Amino acid sequence: MENNKLTFRSLRACLFIGIISFSAAAFAQENKSLPDKVHHAEPIYNDLVRDLGARKGEKEFNVGADIKRMHSADESGYLVEYEFAPIDRLGLEAETDFAYSKSRMANVSSSNQLERLRLSSQYSFYVSKKHAATLAVGYTQIFDFVDGGTAFNPFFIAAKNWHSNWHALVYTGPELAYYYASSRMDMIWQINTSFHYTVPQTDHFIGIEVNQEITSDEIQTTLHPQIKLGLSSKLAIGMAVGLPVSGHEKDLSSFWRLIYQL
């Protein structure tokens, strides 16, 4: 009788250990199957299509506003975007841009219109945890409803972290704009560089973007000092100030972005 009880207890113990071992193995296999991903601080103003090294199933919803006070009018630009990763390392995004202008002149009316639709893709072709670096390429198709045209924007991204809290990122590529009525083609070369410091064990960061647009006539450079606050594991808000330092643009601006991880 005692032998039967001992055998039963042994079988029960073996079964328990087997279940725990199987669960641990399954969990380890699941973790092992996840592709490498390096966390990089993402710029607030010129944000990316999706996280670099995105993993399948990740989704995010953003709303933002760019507010500029000018001599003749107060201009506001609003954006709504949805981004997701259908497969590992590939991000897709759809963004709509709206513009509102409130005239400060008596004989000029205000306006409100849908400006652009942006459809983007981004693929991280190199992800290295060892070097804390990621390289990616992408493409954005822009449909301009105001000027009547479309723009083609291939781009390249390189990001690198130092000591886990210091982040640098470069986003660069041409934007070729084609206008239907005149059949004219214009090109702007974009170089956007960002540097950030992330607060340890939080989703907060502080940093700066240097946004440059280069044409045959000038180089427009705008600094965007910025801050991001992680309000929860899914919700964050980012704020930036636009400070033009070269080019024809002289007006200060402010920008905010609300980020929600779905």
Map each language-model feature to its residues.
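Cleavable N-terminal export/targeting peptides
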Residues: 1-41
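Transmembrane beta-barrel domains of Gram-negative outer membranes and organellar outer membranes
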Residues: 29-262
